[in-house]
């Protein structure tokens, strides 16, 4: 299922408001928005279920996209319908078959936990998820083995299209703040949380701009401390 015309128009309006809001915060944000350009996030136009997104997220952890796609294609090929495996299929799937797809033992454990959580109702449907707040979803989904806060934040941003999410523990975000505020070293998670409060209710847009800083001409990599 894809978004209808009215929903797409709402997204466009939200993008424009985000740019205006961030540009008006201070000179640092004004400069960053001007350098990066218009806010063009990778919004999900398909209404995929949280179960599917979480399975994909865990399956691709610590892998290059090419390797992750190869593993996932093998995984889908062993499904009864040749499409995305159902929670029941993953729950009942033989360990060695999943290993043959390329999954580590740890990932298999996590994938089966996600399947069980979907069957039990802990993982909500897309419709149910849209009625829950960001923190309610984070609290609920991080109970599942292999699912951390960052993974849920990516679900909120890229699948549920939430406008006010700041992945404060993301290293690229922290590096973005180092660039934005011209800091001598990478700031802490708490620094990001504190200084991103002014970006509400458009912290997702702020995160997008911070992610883009590494592509700017005057961006410099953080200096690593010298080994003695």
Swiss-Prot record:
Pfam families on file: HhH-GPD
User: What do the Gene Ontology cellular component annotations say?
Assistant: nucleus; protein-DNA complex
Q: Name one GO biological process term.
A: base-excision repair, AP site formation
Kindly state which reaction or reactions the protein catalyses.
Hydrolysis of alkylated DNA, releasing 3-methyladenine, 3-methylguanine, 7-methylguanine and 7-methyladenine
**Active site residues per record:** 170
Q: Which Gene3D superfamilies match?
A: 1.10.1670.40, Hypothetical protein, domain 2
| InterPro entries linked to this entry | Alkylbase_DNA_Glycosylase/TA, Alkylbase_DNA_glycsylse_CS, DNA_glycosylase, HhH-GPD_domain
Q: Where is this site: Determinant for substrate specificity and/or activity?
A: 150
Query: What does this protein's UniProt record list under function?
Result: Hydrolysis of the deoxyribose N-glycosidic bond to excise 3-methyladenine or 7-methyladenine from the damaged DNA polymer formed by alkylation lesions. Can release ethylated and propylated bases from DNA in addition to 3-methyladenine.
Q: Name its species.
A: Schizosaccharomyces pombe (strain 972 / ATCC 24843) (Fission yeast)
Family to which the UniProt record says this protein belongs:
Belongs to the alkylbase DNA glycosidase AlkA family.
Could you identify this protein by its name? DNA-3-methyladenine glycosylase 1
Q: Is Flavoprotein one of the keywords? A: no
Q: What is its EC number?
A: 3.2.2.21
Q: Which domain of life is it from?
A: Eukaryota
SUPFAM superfamilies recorded: DNA-glycosylase
Q: Which GO terms describe its molecular function?
A: alkylated DNA binding; alkylbase DNA N-glycosylase activity; damaged DNA binding; DNA-1,N6-ethenoadenine N-glycosylase activity; DNA-3-methyladenine glycosylase activity; DNA-7-methylguanine glycosylase activity
Q: Which UniProt keywords apply?
A: DNA damage, DNA repair, Hydrolase
Q: Which gene encodes it?
A: mag1
């Amino acid at each position: 299922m894809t978004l209808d015309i009215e929903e797409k128009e709402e997204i466009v309006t939200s993008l424009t408001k985000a740019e205006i809001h961030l540009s008006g915060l201070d000179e640092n944000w004004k400069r960053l928005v001007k350098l990066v350009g218009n806010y063009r996030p990778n919004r999900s136009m398909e209404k995929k279920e949280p179960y599917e997104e979480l399975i994909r997220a865990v399956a691709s952890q610590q892998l290059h996209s090419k390797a992750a796609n190869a593993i996932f294609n093998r995984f889908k090929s062993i499904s009864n319908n040749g499409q995305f495996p159902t929670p029941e299929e993953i729950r009942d799937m033989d360990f060695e078959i999943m290993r043959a797809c390329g999954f580590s033992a740890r990932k298999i454990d996590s994938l089966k936990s996600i399947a069980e959580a979907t069957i039990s109702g802990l993982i909500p449907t897309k419709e149910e998820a849209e009625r829950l707040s960001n923190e309610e979803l984070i609290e609920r989904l991080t109970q599942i083995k292999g699912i951390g806060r960052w993974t849920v934040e990516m679900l909120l941003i890229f699948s549920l299209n939430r406008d006010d999410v700041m992945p404060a523990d993301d290293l690229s975000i922290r590096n973005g703040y180092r660039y934005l505020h011209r800091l001598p070293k990478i700031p802490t998670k708490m620094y990001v949380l504190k200084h991103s409060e002014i970006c509400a209710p458009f912290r997702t847009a702020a995160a997008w701009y911070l992610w883009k800083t590494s592509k700017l001409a005057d961006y410099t990599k953080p200096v690593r401390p010298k080994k003695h």
